Amino acid sequence: MQKIVVRKEEAQKREFKGVSLDSLAVGEKSMVTKMNYVKGNFATTHRHPHEQCGYVVSGEYRLRVELEDKPIDVLLHAGDSYAIPGNTPHSFEVITGGEVIDVFTPHREDYL
């Protein structure tokens, strides 16, 4: 049964490729995660079938998204957000550690 409310202390804590993350709400088709980054964390260029929408709570990050018509290379700061379509190559580098909230649709089994 799907959990409607997840209290802070109930969040499932995981480590994925050296990054600490909390699996927060998990719905039927999507999930919310809180990524806890430290300076030097990175994700090399990769793709996954999940749409990924994120909100930068704190820290500074370099996001690269390889769109066919125009590649994007941008610095993200607190308050910025992004939406990466599924199966789109992208990479992520942590400049200053902090927290990012990500929503994945469908949910990522490797984060559960």
List PLM regions with ranges.
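A short, N-terminal "cap"/entry segment at the start of jelly-roll beta-barrel domains
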Residues: 1-30
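Conserved short histidine dyad/triad with adjacent acidic residue
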Residues: 31-48
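Short hydrophobic/aromatic-rich beta-strand segments that constitute the beta-sheet cores
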Residues: 33-34, 63, 102
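Short beta-strand His + acidic residue motifs that chelate non-heme Fe in jelly-roll/DSBH
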Residues: 43-45, 63-64, 84, 89-95
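Glycine- and acidic-residue-biased ligand/ion/polar-headgroup-sensing regions
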Residues: 50-66
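Short acidic-glycine-tyrosine-enriched beta hairpin
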Residues: 68-86
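Ligand-binding loop in jelly-roll beta-barrel domains
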Residues: 86-110
